[in-house]
């Protein structure tokens, strides 16, 4: 009989064999290992190293070396409906130029999902860092806890966006949870927006990197909501009968939030204008075009480029994602939750 350690190592190696480079900006991977979400949620996490140590034990390696950096994300999200009646969710992830990784997961006690990972979490932000080298390749095992957005088999989708204000550090006696573990938990455990709101409310949030974050959620029923934290209290912004399209960038929508720099208001207004002109109905390719128009592309004061690492349009009814990576909008890919490892170039 194989030992638990041997089984874990075999699953880890099987996962890494699926790691595939599509081009300079995009990788894919099918995660075949256990990442132990249930036990991590039970014991809680207050920082990156809590999840890293937990994951190292699950996959039997000490080669997972996270290096998240406080350089400033600048993202955009919105929900809408396409002409066929499907509910869609658009997302730009703007950050230090680096490849992104599309990762499929299929936990034993959760929903299957496909998510997009910011590889700066484990390859230090260098755009063409060779993940194929063994020492770097092992770091891809951190993918389940480095997802920034994704969709699951029920059509529930989520994305995180940064706010430039002090981090949320709740201390109400609930089990602590960090930003990326909350995203993973929502994808694995929630079928609807309401279930995700309930999940977030059941934990004490501990933000990463000394910054605050908010989240937009969407599901196959057409429901969307925004979760924000102001002064360590959780707030939920919901749709109303006159406003089905919610939009999020990098400033608070909750009254009392610190919007000292109004970052992202221009992007918000451009998205809002376009959706209003279309009465909230927009084709997926047009949604991608809108994302391209609000994507950031500039040189940071520290010398690196800030771009849209990826632009994604999730279809909550198809359980799919239309994706462009590295601001190359001439290359469009489609990925489905139920087709792990399948790369559809459009």
State each model region's role:
Residues 1-190, 282-346:
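N-terminal mature-domain region immediately after signal-peptide cleavage
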Residues 92, 154, 161-163, 218-220, ...:
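Structured loops at beta-to-helix junctions and adjacent beta-edge loops in soluble globular domains
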Residues 96, 193-194, 203-211, 278, ...:
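Short secondary-structure junctions and interdomain/linker hinges
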Residues 100-101, 169-172, 198, 226-230, ...:
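A short secondary-structure junction signal
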Residues 183-190, 195-205:
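Short N-terminal edge-element motif at the start of the domain
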Residues 210-255:
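Extended amphipathic alpha-helical segments with heptad-repeat/coiled-coil character used for oligomerization
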Residues 241-287:
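Charge-rich, low-complexity intrinsically disordered segments
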């Amino acid at each position: 009989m194989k030992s638990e350690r041997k089984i874990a190592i075999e699953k880890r190696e099987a996962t890494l064999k699926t790691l595939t480079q599509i081009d300079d900006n995009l990788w894919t991977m099918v995660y075949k290992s256990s990442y132990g979400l249930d036990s991590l949620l039970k014991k809680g996490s207050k920082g990156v190293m809590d999840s890293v140590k937990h994951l190292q034990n699950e996959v039997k390696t000490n080669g997972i070396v996270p290096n998240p950096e406080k350089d400033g994300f600048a993202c955009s999200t919105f929900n809408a409906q396409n002409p066929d009646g499907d509910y869609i969710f658009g997302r730009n992830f703007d950050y230090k130029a680096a490849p992104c990784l599309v990762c499929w997961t299929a936990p034993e006690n959760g929903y299957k999902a496909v998510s997009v990972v910011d590889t700066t979490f484990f390859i230090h932000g260098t755009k063409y860092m060779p993940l194929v080298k063994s020492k770097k390749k092992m770091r891809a095992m951190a993918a389940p806890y480095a997802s920034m957005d994704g969709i699951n088999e029920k059509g529930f989708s989520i994305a995180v966006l940064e706010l430039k204000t002090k981090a949320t550090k709740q201390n109400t006696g609930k089990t602590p949870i960090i930003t990326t573990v909350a995203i993973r938990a929502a994808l694995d455990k929630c079928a609807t927006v309401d279930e995700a709101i309930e999940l977030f409310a059941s934990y004490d949030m501990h933000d990463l990197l000394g910054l605050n974050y908010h989240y937009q959620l969407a599901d196959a029923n057409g429901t969307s909501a925004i979760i924000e934290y102001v002064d360590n209290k959780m707030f939920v912004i919901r749709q109303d009968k006159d406003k089905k399209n919610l939009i999020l960038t990098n400033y608070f929508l909750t009254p009392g939030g610190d919007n000292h720099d109004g970052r992202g208001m221009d992007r918000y207004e451009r998205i809002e204008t376009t959706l209003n002109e279309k009465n909230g109905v927009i084709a997926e390719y047009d949604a991608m075009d809108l994302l391209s128009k609000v994507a950031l592309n500039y040189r940071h004061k520290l010398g690196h480029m800030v771009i849209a690492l990826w632009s994604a349009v999730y279809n909550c009814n198809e359980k799919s994602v239309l994706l462009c990576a590295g601001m190359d909008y001439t290359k469009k890919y489609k990925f489905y939750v139920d087709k792990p490892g399948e790369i559809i170039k459009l």
